[in-house]
């Protein structure tokens, strides 16, 4: 799931818009005494670094099933996964305000991911460990993935927006992208009925949600859900380098993907069924997670790094046969 927030005005959750309070109000519900409007430390959503005694903490939005997410992440932490869990405060944490949940996490000091082979390997290893700790059923009552209802009209609209944004940036979009996306629409019911193995997962496993200490530390587990395992793997393949200043402005190379998988497979044995459906899954996750990203935000096409990443993703979508499991 992807969230873009224009703070103090609106939250954009894919194509839905809801009103939200200002930053001062958010901090005050946790008894942080602030008078001036805080500045987010993250450009795409409200993330506020504040002091709690001698400790630096972060206040951010979490999802509707906040308690489920916290139970899940506490389990991961107990298993030895480096993941943030709620700070113990004098008030409830997380808290709800006007139907929006917010949580206070510790601020984690560390280095940023830079695309080195050892960083890629350790990231893959971490995701494999996370998946290995999932139960066979949705024990933590996490949100269940159910996005199998895209239609051709949505693809047509999405492609119109993508082509328009690209033209303004002086870029031509390969028509093969639309062909692939329309084909993905036809595959949705096949995937829905495939009964692929599901896992509990943070489901937003990408570089900008990791801090290296030097091992990876997951600082944003708030999109946690119950999802087909290889859907989560495909999302990491596609968007691991999204919205990250230090990361390469492209998808993984084939060699890098194999390094990521080598770490992942230390804990996970993928099934033959997953390997059979992998090509369709890559296309479906692009349809669900990447198409709207390219179509929704014209300004990203004017940023050199995002523009290069988008073009890399398009080339990937047209021919990703060598990215195997």
Residue ranges and their predicted role:
Residues 117-172, 198:
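A cross-family kinase active-site recognition segment
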Residues 288-325:
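ATP/Mg2+ or Mg2+-diphosphate-binding catalytic cores
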Residues 164-195, 202-203:
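Loop-centered beta-sheet repeat module
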Residues 52-139:
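ATP-binding pocket architecture of kinase catalytic cores
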Residues 43-54, 58, 86, 186-231:
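Active-site acidic catalytic loop and adjacent metal/ATP-binding pocket
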Residues 2-90, 213, 230, 324-325:
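Conserved NTP-binding catalytic cores of kinases and kinase-like/nucleotidyltransferase enzymes
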Residues 270-282:
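All-alpha amphipathic helical-bundle segments outside canonical DNA-binding/catalytic cores
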Residues 231-268, 283-301:
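Active-site activation/catalytic loop segments of kinase-like enzymes and analogous catalytic loops
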């Amino acid at each position: 799931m992807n969230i873009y927030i224009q703070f103090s005005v609106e939250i954009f959750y894919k194509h839905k818009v809801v009103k939200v309070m200002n930053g001062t109000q958010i901090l005050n519900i946790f008894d942080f005494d602030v008078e001036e409007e805080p500045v987010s430390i993250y450009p795409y959503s409200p993330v506020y670094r504040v002091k709690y005694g001698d400790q630096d903490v972060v206040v951010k939005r979490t999802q509707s099933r906040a308690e489920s997410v916290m139970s899940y992440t506490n389990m991961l932490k107990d298993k030895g996964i480096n993941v943030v869990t709620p700070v113990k405060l004098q008030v409830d944490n997380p808290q709800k305000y006007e139907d929006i949940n917010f949580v206070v996490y510790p601020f984690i000091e560390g280095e940023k991911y830079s695309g080195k082979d050892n960083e890629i390997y350790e990231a893959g290893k971490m995701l494999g460990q996370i998946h290995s700790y999932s139960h066979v059923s949705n024990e933590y009552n996490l949100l269940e993935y159910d996005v199998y209802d895209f239609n051709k009209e949505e693809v047509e609209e999405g492609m119109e927006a993508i082509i328009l944004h690209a033209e303004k940036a002086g870029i031509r979009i390969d028509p093969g992208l639309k062909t692939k996306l329309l084909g993905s629409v036809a595959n949705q019911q096949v995937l829905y009925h495939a009964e692929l193995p599901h896992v509990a997962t943070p489901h937003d496993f990408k570089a900008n949600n990791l801090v290296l200490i030097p091992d990876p530390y997951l600082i944003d587990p708030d999109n946690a859900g119950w999802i087909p395992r290889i859907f989560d793997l495909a999302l990491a393949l596609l968007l691991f380098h999204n919205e990250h200043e230090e990361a390469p402005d492209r998808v993984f190379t084939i060699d890098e993907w194999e390094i990521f998988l080598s770490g992942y497979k230390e804990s996970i044995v993928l099934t033959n069924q997953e390997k059979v459906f992998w090509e369709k899954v890559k296309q479906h996750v692009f349809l669900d997670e990447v198409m709207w990203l390219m179509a929704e935000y014209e300004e990203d096409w004017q940023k050199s790094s995002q523009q290069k990443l988008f073009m890399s993703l398009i080339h990937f979508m047209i021919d990703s046969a060598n990215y195997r499991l």
